[in-house]
Amino acid sequence: MKQEPQQQQPAQQPPPAGAGVPAFLSKLWALVGEAPSNQLITWSQNGQSFLVLDEQRFAKEILPKYFKHNNMASFVRQLNMYGFRKVVHVDSGIVKLERDGLVEFQHPYFKQGREDLLEHIKRKVSSSRPEENKISQEDLSKIISSAQKVEIKQETIESRLSALKRENESLWREVAELRAKHLKQQQVIRKIVQFIVTLVQNNQLVSLKRKRPLLLNTNGPTKSNVFQQIVKEPADNNNHVPLNRTEGLKQREQISDDIIIYDVTEDVADEENTMVDEENAPITPETNEDTTSDSSNCSRSPDIVIVEDDNEEEYAPVIQGDKSTESVAVSANDPLSPVSDSTSPLMSSAVQLNNQSTLTAEDPVSMMDSILNENGVISQNINLLGKVELLDYLDSIDCSLEDFQAMLSGRQFSIDPDLLFDLFTSSVQMNPTDHIPNTKMETKGIETTKSNAGPAASQETQVSKPKSDKQLIQYTAFPLLAFLDGNPGSTVESGSSATETPSSVDKPLEVDELLESSLDPEPTQSKLVRLEPLTEAEASEATLFYLCELAPAPMDTDMPFLDN
């Protein structure tokens, strides 16, 4: 009964196309409102939705009339595209099953009698829009352009990296070459040092073959007698004049190899008496087998050994002589011999007044000869040189060093790496107070005599002025040669006061007393400084080192030589 009034209503015509309503909505509005189709599709009782009574018949009979298909699924999909939703009836939480296949669809703007609301029903738009696609294309073009720029920069960076790699490789090769050159230079320097040390060690070994007594032993083997040059210096004259004299008070076999000069006490009267007795005493020459063979050299090569004895009671000078020399008595009235006159400039230049002097145990001339010449031989005809000759001699030494360098550049030598460490770390470091003498002890020296006194000098003048001919004389050694000889040490004596040399002995001793003192089983402790014999020519060459004013090297202590 309710459907009859709906069938009597006139059929609603679809809105014109110009109204902006989609064709699907217009067809749907006409389909629901037409009377012939009300049996299959119709409005609901409240007019807010429409119902499909029989889906199969509706798909076969109604859909082909309004649409180009008879597929119910396509119709439902189109309804969903415009926002229609399927209505589900729920009674007490249970879905009401449609026996007859009733399906209800609902839209807020699709209502019965409200055709004007159809304009508000819009089809859903897809998520992808062409504008958005255009924007993404622009972004893509930007990304592509930026990627191209990055690629160009990357190529530039790669080229720079390759250049840096090549430069780095060249630098490493250069560093390796420089390291190799540096290593070779170090090896050359080590070989040079090794060669120099070898020369010094060879020279030292040669010098060790000479017979030398122990420094702390006063008894030793016999030794050839030599002339002793005693320098006497008058009070009014500063020139040192050497005098050849033989004053042997002991036999060579019974005394030490070295000359012993005992310190003189401060008793002035005993000194005066001793000076008178000494000049009037006979001189006994010594005989030895070595004297006959070496008399010519020994007469010109003094062997001076200074012994400082702790015994303060007895003092006696022992001076060696050659058997070929006549026994003479030297007095204040006797003139000087021609030999002493010829060697007076030598001794005046060789003996210097130096408050900071030290002593060496090796012959400086022979040491320098062994360095400059491999065979250790130098001409014996070198006389006393002047300033010009001295400069020429030093130039010759420089030339020898240049030849030395040229010889080193053309030869190969082996070197021990440990030797350099021992060479530069074996220097002796001693306490400067170890060798400072006691202020109460007497210093040792060389007796000085009058020079150019002449026959007019009388003995009374000597007695009246016993201390007028005493001079402070010290011996200056050679530190460079002492270091090369392998005996470095500290200074023997240092201080503000100069060393004093006694001119005479305290008491004259007889030959028997000297023999008894030499046979003493417990000899007193003494300090020895050994000087090897020098010829006249060698002594003249030694003057060069005094003119150079080389600082001396100490020899109080025995130092080990460099190891091979």
UniProtKB/Swiss-Prot annotation:
The keyword Cell cycle does not apply. Gene3D superfamilies: Winged helix-like DNA-binding domain superfamily/Winged helix DNA-binding domain. It is found in: Cytoplasm; Nucleus. Its main location: cytoplasm. Residues 448-465 have a biased composition (Polar residues). Residues 133-206 are annotated as: Hydrophobic repeat HR-A/B. One of its GO terms (molecular function) is DNA-binding transcription factor activity. Residues 390-415 are annotated as: Hydrophobic repeat HR-C. GO terms for cellular component: chromatin; cytoplasm; nucleus. Residues 21-126 bind DNA. It holds the Pfam family Vert_HS_TF. Residues 271-301, 320-347, 448-468 are annotated as: Disordered. Keywords: Activator, Cytoplasm, DNA-binding, Nucleus, Phosphoprotein, Stress response, Transcription, Transcription regulation. GO terms for biological process: negative regulation of protein ubiquitination; protein stabilization; response to light stimulus; response to sodium arsenite. The keyword Transcription regulation applies. Expressed in most tissues with the exceptions of blood and liver. Residues 271-280 have a biased composition (Acidic residues). DNA-binding protein that specifically binds heat shock promoter elements (HSE) and activates transcription. HSF2 shows constitutive DNA binding activity, even without heat shock. Homotrimer. Belongs to the HSF family. This is Heat shock factor protein 2. It comes from Gallus gallus.
